[in-house]
């Protein structure tokens, strides 16, 4: 109570922070008359003037006021929009590296122009991050008009660009793109062989739109680049055939944690069933050599118990397509990881696509922490403010609205059963539709949106198909005539193609729109209709001229009239029902259930009441909803029973809302803990990733890596001597035979080690010096024979390729370690500390293996004389087919797409001309492999992709023919 009194007197910390920006807002406003008087050329010249001030020692903060004033005037001239004072405050928050929380319709896109322009003046690049390609392209085109007017360049990073186009976009002053594209470009850059091929030029400043969606909802989802592995589709089908025979007592299912495991009885049943099916040929299921079978059983079990068709995924065109739980969109190209997607494909009897092996990965948490300065924008961040502060060191500032929010958020209506809840929703839709009030109904899944659609059809409503050319005509005719159409639209993954039209017209009088979660849609619902959409749809055939202008004026007038109707569509007071006040018109949001996160509910509510418009929102719940059933209090059901509610009757009370909010807070806290835990483990890999990537980039930047190669050779000899000649041991105790064998194997040297050991007074240091001298002499002769230029090229490529190969193997090993490390807790040992310790040992092993393998390969390189190319390839050896994935370590969800290597993009792979050393790829030769001529392949590793181009491993293709 004292806190609330103090808050009223002194204001909140947020109020005080916002107040602190007001003096600079006043300074910007004071500059406005002076800047308004400038010509376009003079306004554009201010960019060069501000750059000069930076070059002369001023900081970005020093020039913030004139820079913001310049952008404001440019935006006004380019598309007639002037930044409000609160938008200037939002821009300052972003410039300082904070999160600006701005309500729907408050112009976040326009706000970003202020800090983007200011920071772009440094010439180090500014990245604006959006959630999809459409928004990246739209915002770059729209806001790019302002930047180009002021003399800055703008680029866009979207799917399908080749490396040259990406490099050009990153070289611009300002770059728009999606979070996935930025992350994958970073990973791809760290798989290339020349600095000249790198697309990105550093991580200076990023502004993340919908920051809560990207840095919170997707924080656990690593970006993964992977390559194909062996086809095991028959095994997936065979294991899947066993799942329908499992009874419920054979497994433990935890919906809250989304986990499932076989009971002891279930293990016995599966073992016996697999023996009968010929899948378990020897030993027990959990024997080490059967670990792959265990993995397949677990994934098949998850597919059948944790994942539901039309809720978590749909089947379309012989594919299992994931549904995003936050937006309800189809995630074309996304795939679940670790064989789960293949298990779902087996379950649904569709074509099973091959699995992939991780080649490089990074989480969004660690990618975005690469930036020197990071900022974000969203309409809903306050509920996650603690997480932003702890993980990203970002403060959330609630920016005041330009106009007060007029939306009325009503208390939830809670029913006993789902059926009663839906009946209540249909009744409310009937009432609102009769008043011509536009309604947006939010559902949690495709399944639920289609269930509600079926109920509406039974109630006499029909589905509005926006693929029909006359659909919009009918919508507007009904609005003009004041007719009740009893028609509705469905916005979910199945109707993705119609999304823009459905959202644009959701504010027309009498519109009924059923939508899965609206998070990240990026399109405002405007009351009365969307002018731009109508012009595009209705006037696309008209050229510019008086006729088109007249038609546009008519559409504007009709939208204004429709807006007036929508504003007047509120529900009058009903004293008999205990409601003394009128309820407002505007867009009516009806939520069919609460989401696990309050933030998602707030995003749905925020679709109504934009820019001071009136609006209304209400959630309809039942005790059978997932949130209430899994996380809600058992006492709530008892309480409703005691109240003696009749069939179809609901309870409405603020206490119910508080109880639900507590359930949501429990879930949010659990999810936060999971994300923090993921980050702790990923930080271990991230530290190693930074070392490897920095070292790799250092190698790429050197003209010659001879010094590194020499140091590696010397280190290998030190290790060999230490391994076979114990300290202070007599010569008779030395492992001379082992030393000679290893010297031959690694250094390719045939030296009389036994004779040296018999010499009087010989010591380990003398042995080391002789081996080093012999190795250096042999390598110098090889270099002279091959030529210095060729040797330098081969050294660099061997070093980079070997590092890549070992790093990929290391990633797989760390992943396996992480999956089993949790069991250490049963031995009273901290799994995280155990993981750190073992990961460190594994990394040391990687460094040792790198020295030995590079030394061994370079000691055997021979040149095979063929027709020489015009010049040495800049790109190094060709890379195998690769895919980009977006993996969730908890749910297993993946985004997967071609990673930019292949047609249209060299991806750093370079031409087919390359080198090969024994033990790596071929017989130690610089040669060109012809896929049709096996004589040009040299020696191929059994696990390498077959040079014929089949995509299979060599041992399963041409290698099997030679075996």
UniProtKB/Swiss-Prot annotation:
Swiss-Prot/TrEMBL cofactor(s): Zn(2+)
Its subcellular locations are: Cell inner membrane; Cytoplasm
Q: Name one GO molecular function term.
A: protein-exporting ATPase activity
Gene Ontology terms, cellular component aspect? cell envelope Sec protein transport complex; cytosol; plasma membrane
Question: Which Pfam families does the record associate with it?
Answer: P-loop_SecA, SEC-C, SecA_DEAD, SecA_PP_bind, SecA_SW
How does this chain assemble? Monomer and homodimer. Part of the essential Sec protein translocation apparatus which comprises SecA, SecYEG and auxiliary proteins SecDF-YajC and YidC.
The name under which this protein is listed is Protein translocase subunit SecA
Q: What is the lineage of its organism?
A: Bacteria, Pseudomonadati, Pseudomonadota, Alphaproteobacteria, Hyphomicrobiales
């Amino acid at each position: 109570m004292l806190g609330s009194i103090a808050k009223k007197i002194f204001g909140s910390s947020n109020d005080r922070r916002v107040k602190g920006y007001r003096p600079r807002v006043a300074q910007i406003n004071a500059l406005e008359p002076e800047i308004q008087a400038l010509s376009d050329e003079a306004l554009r010249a201010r960019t060069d003037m501000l750059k000069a001030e930076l070059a002369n020692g001023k900081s970005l903060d020093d020039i913030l006021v004139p820079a913001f004033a310049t952008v404001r005037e440019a935006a006004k001239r380019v598309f007639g929009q002037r930044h409000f004072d609160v938008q200037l405050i939002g821009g300052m928050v972003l410039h300082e590296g904070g999160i600006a929380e701005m309500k729907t319709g408050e112009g976040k896109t326009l706000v970003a122009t202020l800090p983007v322009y200011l920071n772009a003046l440094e010439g180090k690049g500014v990245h604006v991050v959006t959630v999809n390609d459409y928004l990246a392209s739209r915002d770059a085109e729209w806001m790019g008009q302002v930047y180009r007017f002021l003399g800055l360049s703008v680029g866009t990073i979207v799917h399908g660009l080749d490396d040259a186009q990406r490099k050009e976009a990153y070289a611009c002053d300002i770059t728009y793109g999606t979070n996935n594209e930025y992350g994958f470009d970073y990973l791809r850059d760290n798989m290339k062989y020349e600095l000249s091929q790198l697309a990105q030029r550093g991580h200076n400043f990023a502004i993340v739109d919908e920051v809560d969606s990207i840095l919170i909802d997707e924080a656990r989802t690593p970006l993964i680049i992977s390559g194909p592995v062996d086809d095991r589709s028959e095994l997936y089908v065979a294991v899947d055939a066993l799942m329908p025979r499992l009874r419920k007592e054979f497994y433990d299912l935890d919906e809250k944690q989304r986990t499932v495991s076989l009971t002891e009885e279930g293990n016995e049943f599966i073992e016996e069933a697999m023996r009968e099916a010929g899948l378990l040929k020897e030993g027990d299921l959990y024997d080490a050599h059967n670990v792959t079978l265990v993995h397949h059983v677990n994934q098949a079990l998850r597919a059948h118990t944790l994942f539901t068709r039309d809720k978590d995924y749909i089947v379309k065109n012989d594919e299992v397509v994931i549904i995003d739980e936050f937006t309800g969109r189809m995630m074309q190209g996304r795939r679940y990881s670790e064989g789960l997607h293949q298990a779902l494909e087996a379950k649904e009897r569709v074509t099973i696509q091959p699995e992939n092996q991780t080649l490089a990965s990074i989480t969004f948490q660690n990618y975005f922490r690469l930036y020197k300065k990071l900022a974000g924008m969203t309409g809903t961040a306050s509920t996650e403010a603690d997480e932003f502060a702890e993980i990203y060191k970002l403060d959330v500032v609630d920016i005041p609205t330009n106009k007060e929010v007029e939306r009325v958020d009503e208390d939830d209506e809670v029913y006993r059963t789902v059926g009663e809840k839906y009946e209540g929703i249909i009744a409310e839709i009937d009432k609102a539709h009769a008043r011509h009030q536009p309604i947006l109904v939010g559902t949690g899944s495709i399944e639920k949106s289609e269930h509600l659609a079926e109920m509406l059809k039974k109630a006499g409503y029909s589905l509005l198909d926006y693929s029909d050319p006359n659909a919009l005509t009918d919508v507007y005719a009904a609005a003009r005539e004041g007719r009740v159409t009893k028609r509705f639209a469905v916005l979910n993954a199945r109707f993705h193609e119609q999304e823009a039209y459905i959202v644009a017209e959701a504010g027309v009088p009498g519109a009924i729109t059923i939508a899965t979660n609206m998070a990240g849609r990026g399109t405002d619902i405007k009351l009365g209709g969307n002018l731009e959409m109508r012009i595009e749809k209705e006037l696309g055939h008209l050229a510019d001229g008086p006729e088109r202008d007249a038609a546009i004026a008519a559409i504007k007038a009709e939208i204004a009239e429709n807006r007036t109707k929508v504003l007047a569509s509120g529900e009058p007071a009903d004293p008999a029902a205990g409601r003394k006040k009128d309820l407002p018109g505007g867009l009516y949001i009806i939520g069919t259930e609460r989401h696990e996160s309050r933030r998602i509910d707030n995003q749905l509510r925020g679709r109504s009441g934009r820019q001071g418009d009136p609006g209304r929102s209400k959630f309809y719940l039942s005790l059978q909803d997932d949130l209430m059933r899994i996380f809600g209090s058992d006492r709530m059901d008892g309480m409703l029973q005691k109240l003696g509610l009749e069939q179809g009757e609901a309870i409405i009370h603020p206490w119910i809302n508080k109880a639900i909010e507590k359930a949501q807070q429990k879930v949010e806290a659990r999810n936060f803990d999971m994300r923090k835990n993921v980050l702790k483990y990923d930080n271990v890999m991230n530290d190693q990733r930074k070392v490897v990537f920095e070292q790799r980039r250092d190698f790429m930047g050197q003209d010659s890596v001879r010094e590194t190669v020499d140091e590696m050779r010397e280190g290998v000899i030190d290790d060999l001597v230490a391994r076979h000649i114990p300290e202070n041991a007599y010569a008779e105790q030395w492992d001379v035979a082992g030393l000679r064998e290893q010297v031959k194997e690694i250094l390719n040297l045939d030296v009389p080690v036994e004779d040296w050991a018999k010499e009087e007074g010989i010591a380990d240091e003398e042995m080391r010096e002789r081996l080093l001298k012999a190795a250096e002499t042999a390598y110098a002769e090889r270099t002279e024979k091959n030529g210095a230029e060729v040797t330098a090229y081969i050294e660099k490529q061997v070093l980079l390729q070997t590092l890549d190969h070992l790093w990929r193997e290391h990633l797989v090993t760390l992943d396996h370690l992480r999956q089993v490390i949790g069991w250490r807790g049963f031995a009273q040992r901290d799994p995280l500390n155990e993981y750190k310790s073992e990961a460190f040992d594994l990394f040391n092993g990687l460094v040792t293996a790198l020295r030995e393998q590079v030394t061994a390969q370079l000691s055997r390189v021979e040149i095979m004389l063929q027709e020489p190319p015009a010049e040495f390839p800049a790109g190094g050896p060709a890379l195998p087919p690769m895919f980009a994935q977006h993996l969730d370590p908890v749910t297993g969800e993946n985004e997967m797409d071609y990673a930019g290597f292949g047609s249209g993009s060299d991806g750093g792979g370079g031409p087919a001309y390359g080198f090969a050393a024994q033990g790596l790829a071929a017989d130690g030769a610089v040669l060109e492999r012809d896929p049709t001529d096996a004589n040009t392949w040299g020696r191929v590793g059994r696990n390498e992709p077959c040079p014929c181009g089949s995509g299979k491993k060599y041992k399963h293709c041409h290698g099997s023919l030679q075996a």
